[in-house]
Amino acid sequence: MQVTLKTLQQQTFKIDIDPEETVKALKEKIESEKGKDAFPVAGQKLIYAGKILNDDTALKEYKIDEKNFVVVMVTKPKAVSTPAPATTQQSAPASTTAVTSSTTTTVAQAPTPVPALAPTSTPASITPASATASSEPAPASAAKQEKPAEKPAETPVATSPTATDSTSGDSSRSNLFEDATSALVTGQSYENMVTEIMSMGYEREQVIAALRASFNNPDRAVEYLLMGIPGDRESQAVVDPPQAASTGAPQSSAVAAAAATTTATTTTTSSGGHPLEFLRNQPQFQQMRQIIQQNPSLLPALLQQIGRENPQLLQQISQHQEHFIQMLNEPVQEAGGQGGGGGGGSGGIAEAGSGHMNYIQVTPQEKEAIERLKALGFPEGLVIQAYFACEKNENLAANFLLQQNFDED
């Protein structure tokens, strides 16, 4: 028989197999034909007519119609996300280890050592993934600058790591962000995903509730549909939706503040218990959880903002995605303070949180941009939220708001 298989990313392929064979044999055939990295047997879940196929059961028992398709869901191993950012950075120091060692000796003899060269000897002896991206590329750039110009070595060596750090930091941040949001769908992809999961035999309301509970992660949404939504997240998602506009204007900026203020906390608190547990005591995280539960599609933008403000925190999130999602699913604690309004001119926009008012300063140009977005017919709270989430880019914010309106319709 010929089995048509379809992934949650809407990739379709066919496998020829004897119906007397077991489901596990089909999984092994998928792995051999499509690759062990993309479709490992241990990570495959085959779903037909809303049921997970049992490995030891023969295919004929499920009466699979060749005109229909079997859904393939692949769960990625947790360890894969850890070395990803570091592997791209390690190749450069590895290839220049010999040059680096000679560079270190010449710099040591210089009359005035440059502080930026302190980490030069590190990559020669340290290669684990825990080494930071910013310290690794420094010797590579130092070696390149030392070789052609030995006399004025101090000037280029001191300045070159800055450029290298910024580029490597950006690339590692983008890798972390892609890793953290790779499983999320928004916009038109969201609608396609709803249709795709409905084709497994579920009602639209069930699918939307599962996607909401999983924050638009299709793999986890299917698991919720099969196993049940934990903690009745379905009912929590509908509680108090109007508060989004009244609790405060730029809640995404509160998340940025949380990211900026938790760098030190991460290093001190993560030693005891789970690395993300410290977030529970952060009022900014409470606000973020409330925002995301009311509007899950904001999660990618907020993760991107965290990546800019605190890449270490984003790395922790990407390494512990399931725990992070679980924390976001927890009931929101009662927040103190009432919602605030907007100021005029170059004044500030009020934001509620933790029993007192916070103000975000905006320029007259930013105020005008917010007013133009409000003129499109969106409430002020949502406009400000979108404007800050989109890095004060008016066009992106407008597209985001229009997309939100389309999704709700």
Swiss-Prot record:
Functional note: Multiubiquitin chain receptor involved in modulation of proteasomal degradation. Binds to polyubiquitin chains. Proposed to be capable to bind simultaneously to the 26S proteasome and to polyubiquitinated substrates and to deliver ubiquitinated proteins to the proteasome. May play a role in endoplasmic reticulum-associated degradation (ERAD) of misfolded glycoproteins by association with PNGase and delivering deglycosylated proteins to the proteasome.
Domain STI1: 274-317
Compositional bias annotation for Polar residues: 160-175
Compartmental location: Nucleus; Cytoplasm
Source organism phylogeny: Eukaryota, Metazoa, Chordata, Craniata, Vertebrata
Cellular component, GO, one term: cytosol
Stated name of the protein: UV excision repair protein RAD23 homolog B
PANTHER family noted in UniProt: UV EXCISION REPAIR PROTEIN RAD23 (PTHR10621), UV EXCISION REPAIR PROTEIN RAD23 HOMOLOG B (PTHR10621:SF13)
Keywords from the named record: Cytoplasm, DNA damage, DNA repair, Nucleus, Phosphoprotein, Proteasome, Repeat, Ubl conjugation pathway
Phosphotyrosine modification, residue list: 202
Subunit structure as annotated in this protein's UniProt entry: Component of the XPC complex composed of XPC, RAD23B and CETN2. Interacts with NGLY1 and PSMC1. Interacts with ATXN3. Interacts with PSMD4 and PSMC5. Interacts with AMFR. Interacts with VCP; the interaction is indirect and mediated by NGLY1.
Major location (coarse): nucleus
Entry-linked SMART domains: STI1, UBA, UBQ
Record has Nucleus as a keyword: yes
UBA domain sequence ranges: 188-228, 364-404
Phosphoserine PTM positions: 160, 174, 199
Compositionally biased region (Basic and acidic residues): 144-153
TM helices/strands, residue ranges: none
Domain (Ubiquitin-like) ranges: 1-79
